[in-house]
Amino acid sequence: MEKLYGIPKFAQMENITHQDATYYGKEVEIIVDYAFSRLFNVQIELQQWKSGDSLFKEFIDQGKEGLHSIGIYVDNLDSYIGEFKKRGIDVLQTGQIGKYKFVYLDTEETFGALLEIGETLKRKRKK
């Protein structure tokens, strides 16, 4: 991919544990390897499931390959979750890695892939 598309080398992170993770509302421990790069202004994220009940394991158990989800960054994760819930779209999985908090929404049937919505948590200002 690097040569063909001219994208930078992938930055790799191994054995990353998702903090505060839930899968269908149940607390779980999820461990994943990640690799990140960019193609123009699009982030490419490769994931390799290591352990724990999760949408990643479910995807593999169903014999699927390829695109798992499309992610977007937002400023206020909770407001987006609320808006999707109003439309009948539920949260399937949640987690946090460092300051990045994210959810996966049940959009596969209507959108063709799961939608990941994430927010980078900001420092609280001292008053």
Model-flagged regions — what are they?
Residues 5, 65, 112:
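Structured loop/turn residues at beta-strand edges in well-structured enzyme cores
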Residues 6-12, 19-20, 24-45:
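Short, well-structured hydrophobic secondary-structure segments
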